[in-house]
């Protein structure tokens, strides 16, 4: 299994040796040493989510890893998945972080995912998915969903809401810092961003906030009553 050498400056990963800045994802094992405290967005560390393993040095004070997932130190926030991540086994999870799932650079046949019960927050752009078939099940424990949380590119997408989650417009998430020039643009962005709305279906409780949200913002979806 291939390892990747990280370039680290003042605790920030600024580059990954052998990662492909032209759009080809890295593969193999990604080891995060103890001195890493942040990731530069231009480092191409997680492009395509194709790493097979994510391992964090136990002495790292900021990050941790479990079941091939990159997590906050306390294990409550999912920061990034890789090809072999098993999120369902992480019982401490409360937040799906920004860009935790990002497949926009390479289309997959399908993306089927049930968010673990106990998760409370879906951050800004938590799911940036490019797949022919998509199904995401949102449990009743989820109470807040940030803007652009579902950035889905698919010909057949289905989002199932089991509870009464609050979908937001213009909410940047728990950590995102936007430039002043971006605020007006992002304030117009809904939680569900989907370029082919006629191919999207939503299942949710009839009297839920999700149902009212879809009606209020004119999202072209079909809301059905769950049993």
Where are the regions that the model predicts?
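Structural signature of tandem-repeat unit edges
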Residues: 1-14, 21-40, 47-69, 73-95, ...
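Short glycine-/small-residue-rich flexible loop motifs, especially phosphate/cofactor-binding loops
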Residues: 98, 124, 211
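A structural signal for leucine-rich repeat
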Residues: 172-176
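Short, structured coil segments at secondary-structure junctions
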Residues: 217-218
